[in-house]
């Protein structure tokens, strides 16, 4: 109650602000196009000078509203302006499907773009990034802003006038898409001023990635923004970076990007050398293990836990003395993955097998994700289980989660149709409140209480009866399923009944637009996995409103109430009539795992006979509470992973900051002095401080330096200070000699060398961290806090990595040999071939290793891109 009172208070404040915007807008109505453009230029100077956007919100929003009216023939409703205000304030605007989020975003985008630091509009796919940039482009161009678009495969564009001369003429002669004298709320296409529509057409022009980021507004996908950040931190020249900072971002479908995908990091990866035969061997071994005897399955956490009998059995079959010995950790992972593949990952639910490949099915949308792969060897374990060719496992070069990427922005906002149920997570993780924006027209969809059956068989029979009843009267039905397997089961049942229908699931997604377009037509029955809906509009056909509108039938509840609300939201858009009803059974995964006992008791008390459903508001409430419980569990998992990644994020920032320092430094003398000092002082302190002098151990610890560099004799030094000075001076003298030998190219050579050393150590560190994550999760079963354990281990590991980086740099700068420009070019080309992948779904990338491995074989030299180092 308090939350909704708070929402009302916010909306009341917004309503007053909208009233003020409306007043300014009415003053702008009489102004010429050229005057609006001049006002925009003046406003940009004001905002840019003081970087204070709040003060100019009313004028900016009114300008955008009038520009949209003239260039698009669309005037944002008051509720859309409210949504825009929420976005400007860094909140999540919950706006129902069909309420015009894309247009609402133009106002805060314009206002914040005036500051000059760049605004990012984040969409979920390339098509939407291009579509929205083109759709809203005329508004920004009219007001003097540049608009860029970033797509995958390195494609980047700028939105430009299709006919610049005609656009100029339209501005000079005061043309408007909205005709004079039209006072309605919505301007239909046939009533638009056709001449102005033609004049304000835009198109995409190819530009460089860097230019796209230099635009005032940049549209792109969450993946591409994240990958560009990671790629920027692998460059060998600062000028090759494309992003210019993280100022303000609006994330479309914020719940999907910031919550559902929060656990799946973006990764730049390369191939591992694990043999495919290992995965096949463990796929066979896993079949010998008996569930509940050798291992237990935790379906809630989606993990496998070996029993003592299982451990003994594994040690005997594999032929090791102790499965948990550090040297056997990889064998344990292989076994756990093989058991997961066999017992937790189901064909046609979690993945499909097509053309000899295992393709993941997105659990939230039901879409196929070709090219994406489970990480940590799990995908290979599934390939071994299914008997298809096994592709290489990958190792990580750079990684970041969406949580940590988007938290880098000075200001972050989001928009979606379903967010209120996740408000606590938005607040705790991102510091964003959720504001529920009212619909423009009242929502009249009727949501029925759930029908619960004892078995899935009874449930599906009743669903088919319900579909048949509505089909006979001509009411369109959209049936939502949670997997391909279930959509095809239902389809076969409808075929037996002779009910014509269309199926929309991951296997047929190419026809999605065509199928969805028909879903609201009279007599149409559509079966769809969760994929159908986001970004697609189901319009009612003639006579359908009179039949009650589109009827949504849910075949089971999802773990998240949000996903159910998205399914419901496909009916009753923009004030249309509609209905929704969920059919459930005690055998559904959600109820079976989390609540069948409670609901079963209720059914026994009420003496519900077989085949008879129970339908009661109290039962719907009980199921909602089960979902809340599961949402809490999932949030807890995400929070644990976030806390682990927060540790990694601080370390990542430290490493990337070090890279930037090296990229920007004009002279490395001071930096290398610090490194030599660190290398010398740590060793002198360890082996030759006080009375305990161990010259032999000191010699061994310095043996990685070029032979003959030090002439150590215990009698030469009267104190550890004298020894320290001798060692430091020898390193410094050799460095100066090497610097003179290489000549003017030395800075470039050293820069390439140091960057490659840092990148190589960071890659190895990330690989080790993945093993630590797995290990600390196993320790949690021994009552140890995994977060505390993770922090403790990674603190020492990171410290050790930084020490090794210093040692390696100190050693290699004294061994460097100048090489040709050709090698530099080749190294850059190889770096450019890096492919970027989205984890839990991991693609393999060979590029980075090839650059160095090929050169290692030449001349006994160790290669780091442009430079070679004598062994």
Swiss-Prot record:
Subcellular location field: Cell inner membrane; Cytoplasm
Q: Name one GO cellular component term.
A: cytoplasm
Cysteines joined through disulfide linkages:
none
UniProt-listed SMART domains: SecA_DEAD (SM00957), SecA_PP_bind (SM00958)
Q: Which top EC class is given? A: translocase
Task: Give the reactions, separated by semicolons, that this protein catalyses.
Answer: ATP + H2O + cellular proteinSide 1 = ADP + phosphate + cellular proteinSide 2
Annotated GO biological process: intracellular protein transmembrane transport; protein import; protein targeting; protein transport by the Sec complex
What InterPro entries is this protein classified in? Helicase_ATP-bd (IPR014001), Helicase_C-like (IPR001650), P-loop_NTPase (IPR027417), SecA (IPR000185), SecA_CS (IPR020937), SecA_DEAD (IPR011115), SecA_motor_DEAD (IPR014018), SecA_preprotein_X-link_dom (IPR011130)
Instruction: Mention one GO molecular function.
Output: ATP binding
Topology class, membrane: Peripheral membrane protein
Which terms are listed as keywords in the entry? ATP-binding, Cell inner membrane, Cell membrane, Cytoplasm, Membrane, Nucleotide-binding, Protein transport, Translocase, Translocation, Transport
Q: Where does ATP bind?
A: 80, 98-102, 537
What EC identifiers does the entry list?
7.4.2.8
Q: Classify the main location.
A: membrane
Q: Which domain of life is it from?
A: Bacteria
Q: How does it assemble?
A: Monomer and homodimer. Part of the essential Sec protein translocation apparatus which comprises SecA, SecYEG and auxiliary proteins SecDF. Other proteins may also be involved. A single SecA monomer interacts with SecY in the channel.
| PANTHER family, sorted | CHLOROPLAST PROTEIN-TRANSPORTING ATPASE (PTHR30612:SF0), SECA INNER MEMBRANE COMPONENT OF SEC PROTEIN SECRETION SYSTEM (PTHR30612)
The record's family statement is:
Belongs to the SecA family.
Function summary: Part of the Sec protein translocase complex. Interacts with the SecYEG preprotein conducting channel. Has a central role in coupling the hydrolysis of ATP to the transfer of proteins into and across the cell membrane, serving as an ATP-driven molecular motor driving the stepwise translocation of polypeptide chains across the membrane.
Protein's UniProt name: Protein translocase subunit SecA
Species for this entry: Thermotoga maritima (strain ATCC 43589 / DSM 3109 / JCM 10099 / NBRC 100826 / MSB8)
